Amino acid sequence: MLRTIFLLSAFLLNGIAFSQPGVFIRFTSANTMFPDTARANGHDYSGKHYDALTHYNDSSVLIYVPKNFSPKGSPNLIFWFHGWSNNIDTAYRQYELVSQFEASGRNAILVFPEGPKDAPDSYGGKLEQPAVFQALAKDVVQQLENRKILRRRRSFNINDYDITLAGHSGAYRVISRILNKTPVHEVILFDAMYGGNEYYLEWLSNPEHRFVNIYTKNGGTFDNSRQIAKLITDSLNVPVISVDEPAVNAQLLQSNRKVFIFSEQTHNGVITYHNNWALFLRNTPAR
């Protein structure tokens, strides 16, 4: 059973007060990453054990609905997946994800499913299974319908929604396992192109899909990002543009569907630098 806490603007979350103009909803779902049998005994990394109860037992989902959201057309659900040694609450605060989302003016709803909590782990848990992401999306929609944020439909169909996947660092894995199992039109990666190449290339072969990948020199994604960009052009024959970050502007983002951006920022700095998250959300190609 879903357990829900409804949070409005000027709310208290984990002991810290916030005053965003939109609406927050927190609930739990059986269709998040964890608990999962593959992490029932926790996970070992670099000589340290990360136990299941602390790191792989949180099934929370946090939703943010911006102040001026309008439920017209196919609602855009943007799922953000956090990286290593983070959780949904620390990630959205550290990277200013909600404030940038609000500032972008994007008519969409932001969804944070909990991942490996405060653990160095990219494993996507149950969301790596074929049908689970759509079940999670259904749970999210149900929460929004119950609050009359979205109109209630007779039945849930994933094709009625415009799905975006985004994330940082270790989020690459869960995103790669979802994007070919459900209709996804847009992916935004922040220094996360570590692997899953075969999954990404399959999805990138569609010229209509929008992909933004910003990567750094020392984040471990440089070589693979360059390789993927070359394969898109040489093997898939799909237009792609590769630029250094100073060249990025609204026109460039609005004119290209496959964009690779080299940044001189740090691995954790690429999201907030010049409000990149807001910039990428605000400026999208016409569809």
Task: Give residue ranges: language-model regions.
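C-terminal catalytic histidine-bearing segment of alpha/beta-hydrolase fold enzymes
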Residues: 216-287
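Primarily recognizes the serine-hydrolase "nucleophile elbow" in alpha/beta-hydrolase
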Residues: 158-206
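Active-site nucleophile loop of the alpha/beta-hydrolase fold
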Residues: 115, 188-196, 216-220
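Sec-dependent N-terminal signal peptides
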Residues: 4-13
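Gly/Ser-rich "nucleophile elbow"/oxyanion-hole loop immediately N-terminal to the catalytic nucleophile
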Residues: 125-169
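Active-site machinery of serine-nucleophile hydrolases
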Residues: 74-77, 81-144
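A domain-start/cap signature at the N-terminus of enzymes
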Residues: 19-77, 108, 239-248, 256
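Alpha-helical scaffolding within the catalytic cores
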Residues: 92-101, 194-205, 245-247
